[in-house]
Amino acid sequence: MLTNSPFMKTFFGVDLSASPKKKSAYAVLYEDLTCVTGFFKHDDELVEKVEEYSPEAVGIDAPLSFPQKGYYRLCEKALRRLGIRAFSPLFEGMRSLTLRAIQLRSELEKRGYEVIEIYPGGTQDMLGLPRKNKSREKLYLGLRRLGLRFPESRDGDLLDAVTAALTVFAYKKEEYILVSSSDGCRLVLASPSLKEALLQIKG
């Protein structure tokens, strides 16, 4: 059973679905690398969880803006140059996800929380972890090897939520890569240097 100090800083990650009819996953990462995970459907449920844990920031796995022109944002093009596959917010099924994420960010920011756009698949690429569609088992084991302690689960959405929380941790510990573009897109990935920082925490 995982136990946590109420005085530790927390970092909140969200693997958001496009519709509240489907479950979404969240993860709360503590400074000692223990992690609490769970599911929600409606935005107000997530807002309650965020207020319960009062995180340093919230990372949402979804676009938080639309392209100003064309099909892709400039940050998606930058990711492709890094060899990271990413979808346009205008891709089928992504538009409703993006609208939901933008609304959720607004609700959280009104309550004083910092919200950042993150991309678990990109962070997994940066850290040498397989994506969930390649091997959920290897992704699970890879996150555990980094020192993260979370309830045993091979659920792909939960693993992405844990990766999202880890990306927020990296952002606050200044072990991150910012993909920023003139069209207003700001997307955060964990830097490969995060591995060394995590080893120091593991001791």
Residues of each region from the PLM?
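Phosphate- and other anionic-substrate recognition elements at nucleic-acid/protein interfaces
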Residues: 2-203
